[in-house]
């Protein structure tokens, strides 16, 4: 009767069945192709008399396509000013070499203001291609005279060049900085004054700020 054991588990990544010698994955979270494409394990076989034999094997990993990640971000704009959103506003990272941002899906619309693509209102779930982002077609516009920190929030998911989406949506927050509006709409309380009138109740100008 023989028994099997591992004298080198590759840092806890692998285990072996003592009776059958079947090698299994002990901790899959430690298997990362981008960090290491192979690992060495050392198998020890022991016979009934207690004699042992050790041999080291190389376990090669197969790469799998992993989902990308976006980034929570904040954009600060000026009151009454439209802002063009670019790829940089959404962030993108992917552990797979060669994968790049291909699109952004708008999961929920801004809580205030409007979001348009080429002048047309964006709908929840709409996919915005990177070509449109590069062309400046995605535009956020706050409501007239509106401002404030955290004025609007929207959620989004980035997509890589293999059409995988980030499984966890991110949030884009828009801060709108107030500006001092110039006075407008002058009006006159009356446009006639009686001949030789005394200045008891002269006409007055009024302005809406």
Region spans (language model):
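Acidic, turn/loop-rich segments in luminal/extracellular domains of secretory-pathway
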Residues: 1-69, 74-186, 191-199, 204-209
């Amino acid at each position: 009767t023989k028994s099997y054991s591992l004298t080198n588990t590759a840092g806890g990544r692998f285990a072996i069945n003592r009776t059958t010698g079947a090698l299994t994955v002990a901790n899959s979270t430690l298997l990362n192709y981008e960090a290491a494409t192979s690992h060495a394990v050392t198998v020890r076989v022991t016979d009934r008399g207690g004699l042992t034999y050790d041999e080291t094997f190389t376990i090669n990993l197969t790469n799998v396509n992993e989902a990308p990640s976006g980034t929570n971000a904040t954009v600060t704009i000026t009151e009454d000013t439209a802002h063009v959103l670019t790829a940089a506003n959404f962030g993108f990272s992917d552990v797979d070499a060669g994968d790049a941002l291909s699109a952004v899906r708008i999961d929920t619309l801004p809580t205030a203001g409007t979001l348009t693509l080429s002048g047309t209102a964006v709908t929840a779930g709409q996919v915005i291609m990177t070509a449109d982002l590069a062309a400046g077609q995605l535009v956020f516009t706050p409501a007239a005279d509106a401002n404030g920190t955290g004025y609007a929030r929207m959620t989004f998911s980035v997509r890589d060049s293999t059409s995988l989406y980030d499984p966890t949506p991110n949030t884009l927050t828009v801060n709108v900085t107030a500006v001092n509006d110039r006075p407008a709409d002058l009006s006159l309380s009356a446009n006639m004054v009686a001949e030789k009138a005394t200045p008891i109740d002269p006409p007055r100008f009024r302005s809406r700020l």
